[in-house]
């Protein structure tokens, strides 16, 4: 008889909680086929997505923010009131990275996804390249 692992069950039971807009302070994600991980803050409602990383002066090593939407669509990010240089990855509903862009501090110019995205992941600029993470890599919720 097949029994899913506890990690599998926990991971998939947590997804509805995340997408329903219930607040979670931080969540650990990893990237399939790698040993790379991030601890991310979750922005899963309009208020949290609007605030994003505004007024954040520093990001610790291997941290970021994961923006979640209920449906896939064109997503746009900006850097208003954000002093950090960031990279943003737009991800599919399955968690696959589709596009990665560098973001200029304090820029109010929108950087939009070309492909429909259900998630966006912001990290320190250069984190993706430094860790060998790119288009096609998939996140895993731990």
Question: Where are the regions a protein language model picked out?
Answer:
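Hydrophobic h-region of N-terminal signal peptides that target proteins for export
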Residues: 15-25
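Bacterial N-terminal signal peptides that target proteins for export
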Residues: 2-16
């Amino acid at each position: 008889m097949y029994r899913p692992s506890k990690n599998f069950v926990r991971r998939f039971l947590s997804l509805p909680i995340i997408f329903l807009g219930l607040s979670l302070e931080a969540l650990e994600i990893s990237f399939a086929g790698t040993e790379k991980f991030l601890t991310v803050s979750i922005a899963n409602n309009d208020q949290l997505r609007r605030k994003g990383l505004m007024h954040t002066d520093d990001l610790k090593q291997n941290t970021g923010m994961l923006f979640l939407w209920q449906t896939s669509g064109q997503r746009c990010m900006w850097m208003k009131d954000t002093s950090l240089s960031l990279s943003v990855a737009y991800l599919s509903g399955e968690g696959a990275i589709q596009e990665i862009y560098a973001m200029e501090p304090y820029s109010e110019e929108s950087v939009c996804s070309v492909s429909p995205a259900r998630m966006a992941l912001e990290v320190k600029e250069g984190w993706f390249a430094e860790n060998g993470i790119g288009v096609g890599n998939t996140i895993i919720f731990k």
